């Protein structure tokens, strides 16, 4: 069973890595003593088109093209990339590193520590309709999450909502700008017309960052919140 899963995984990765492939047929496959031998294979190819490639797979694979290196204000290097399932433990540690004040500003209240199911939803996402960018940096031999920005798009991808939080001891390093610019650029590439977010009036750092990036800032006195809206495209 394990070797069959490994075979299917390799075929799937081949299809992901080679956008020219339109079909794969392996027939017959000889199975003996836990080993699989492909006796004949037929692979269909077509001319590669970048835009068409976005829709060729039912489930969008990990968008490795969005991974890039960034330099923080303290002149250290970090990696900006989409979140992935393997980040669950690092994401738990990231959440635990937030001060009560920063956590309150992010979630608009006091929440208990996230459990496995909640963390799974945060790290196992559908890249076609949502995105979570993290800035990750090696510290003491392991990858640590310094900040995260999330974008959730409507089904028609005309509007999107964002949220962002930076580790309490890493604020002032330019992480907010890096994460917000990544979220905005991703929305533009997806054809989103408007990106919006809500924060608390006391979250002055977020408000100033949004204003600097061109968001329209309005206050909802009835809800006691600040609305941030940016028109795109």
Task: List each language-model region with its residue ranges.
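A broad "ordered helical/assembly scaffold" signature
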Residues: 11-14, 30, 180
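Conserved metal-phosphate-binding beta-hairpin within the catalytic cores
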Residues: 20-43, 162
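Glycine-rich, charged/polar anion/phosphate-binding loops
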Residues: 8-12, 24-26, 65, 118-119
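Long, contiguous binding/interaction regions
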Residues: 46-233
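A long amphipathic alpha-helix within ATP-dependent nucleotide-binding catalytic cores
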Residues: 1-23
């Amino acid at each position: 069973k394990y070797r069959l899963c490994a075979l299917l995984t390799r075929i799937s990765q081949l299809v992901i890595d080679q956008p020219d492939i339109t079909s794969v047929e392996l027939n017959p496959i000889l199975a003996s003593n836990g080993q699989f031998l492909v006796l004949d294979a037929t692979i269909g190819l077509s001319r590669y088109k970048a835009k068409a490639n976005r829709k060729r797979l039912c489930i969008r694979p990990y968008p490795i093209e969005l991974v890039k290196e960034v330099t923080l204000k303290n002149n250290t290097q970090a990696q900006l990339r989409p979140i992935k399932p393997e980040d669950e433990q690092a994401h738990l540690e990231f959440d635990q590193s937030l001060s009560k004040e920063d956590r309150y500003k992010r979630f608009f209240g006091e929440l208990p520590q996230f459990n496995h199911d909640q963390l799974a939803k945060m790290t196992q996402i559908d890249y076609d309709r949502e995105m979570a960018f993290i800035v990750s940096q090696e510290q003491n031999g392991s990858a640590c999450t310094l900040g995260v920005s999330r974008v959730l798009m409507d089904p028609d991808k005309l509007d999107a909502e964002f949220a962002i939080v930076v580790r309490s001891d890493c604020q002032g390093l330019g992480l907010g700008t890096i994460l917000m610019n990544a979220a905005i650029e991703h929305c533009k590439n997806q054809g989103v017309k408007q990106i919006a977010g809500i924060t608390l009036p006391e979250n002055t750092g977020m408000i100033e960052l949004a204003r600097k990036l061109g968001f329209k800032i309005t206050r909802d006195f009835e809800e006691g919140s600040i609305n941030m809206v940016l028109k795109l495209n």
